[in-house]
Amino acid sequence: MRLFSVVLAVFTLLLPSQAFAQRIKDVASIQGVRSNQLVGYGLVVGLPGTGEQSPFTEQSFRTMLRNFGISLDANTKPKIRNVAAVAVHADLPAFAKPGQTIDITVSSVGEAASLQGGTLLQTFLRGVDGKVYAVAQGSLVVSGFGAQGGDGSRIVVNTPTVGRIPNGAMVEQSVPTGFANGDTLTLNLHYPDFSTAKSLADTINERLGAQPENGYVIAKPIDAASVRVSAPRDVGQRVGFLATLENFEFTPADAPARVVINSRTGTIVIGSDVRLLPAAITHGGLTVTISENQQVTQPNAFADGQTAITTQSIVDVDLADSRMFKFEPGVTLDQLVRAVNEVGAAPGDLMAILEALRHAGALRGELVII
């Protein structure tokens, strides 16, 4: 409980009250210059009996042998406990060239117990267009492990059915980009905001000597997310132009007043501009505890009876004392958090209070629950 109070207070106090200068490269990206997702299906071999015997794994195994010129009789059922069917995925960076290597992630798609010690055989990685952009192969690095006893007991640490192969795929072809096309480039903000888009365009025009008053502009905001920038046609000059442009510093607009709640972990992040309207709050907690004890009833030694097991249930209800808080106009959520923490409230209590304040219209800010 005390840890929650300290961590939440730190989150609240460290949030800046004013925006600060940032580089363009840290707040925006170039439209069309991005990574691409690749995916493939393959087989991992060499497992120490931790593979699987599923139908699709057997079918894949037969297909692999057929490609190597080996045919199995249809009635022959191979024992392949050292083989596992896997899905392979990777991100192909922008401008990746043939011959370069990328990291890949390998995940079991069947009932394999572990991929520890396995080797991925040649697997084609395809893009959304169905074309092969990389080929993967290599020995897996698996951080997790598992063990199983003869009675069915089992222990698993981390995730032994997922592994990685650093530099495990070789790029076969590049993905075309529109970087060198046209007379303009478009910068897309990571967090769309009209004020930030205008400030970004004004900074570029000022630093590059544009004269908006005479109708000569280099950067022009398109909407809340994008700024169009005139750029040289020559590829070499365009690279140098962007190298200079992306290091310009400007001051983005203040972030919107927002409260973000992760209901699964109890994490609460509060923006510094969030305010409360006058409100009175009361919140009480009802705790119900149910415990069960097994009791054995034993008959007398010479009595004609049987031993019986009965269950005794104990239900305990604890209604915590509730307190009312009254806040004046303009109170920050930091003050609300401190008031709630003083009575030892749990993260769930604060979540309920914040949601109730939003429904009452007293929370001046966006409430986001993830």
UniProtKB/Swiss-Prot annotation:
Residues 1-21 form the signal peptide. It comes from the Bacteria. GO terms for molecular function: structural molecule activity. Keywords: Bacterial flagellum, Periplasm, Signal. Its main location: periplasm. The keyword Transferase does not apply. Pfam families: FlgI. The keyword Signal applies. One of its GO terms (cellular component) is bacterial-type flagellum basal body, distal rod, P ring. It is found in: Periplasm; Bacterial flagellum basal body. One of its GO terms (biological process) is bacterial-type flagellum-dependent cell motility. The basal body constitutes a major portion of the flagellar organelle and consists of four rings (L,P,S, and M) mounted on a central rod. Belongs to the FlgI family. Assembles around the rod to form the L-ring and probably protects the motor/basal body from shearing forces during rotation. This is Flagellar P-ring protein. It comes from Alteromonas mediterranea (strain DSM 17117 / CIP 110805 / LMG 28347 / Deep ecotype). The lineage of its organism: Bacteria, Pseudomonadati, Pseudomonadota, Gammaproteobacteria, Alteromonadales. The gene is flgI.
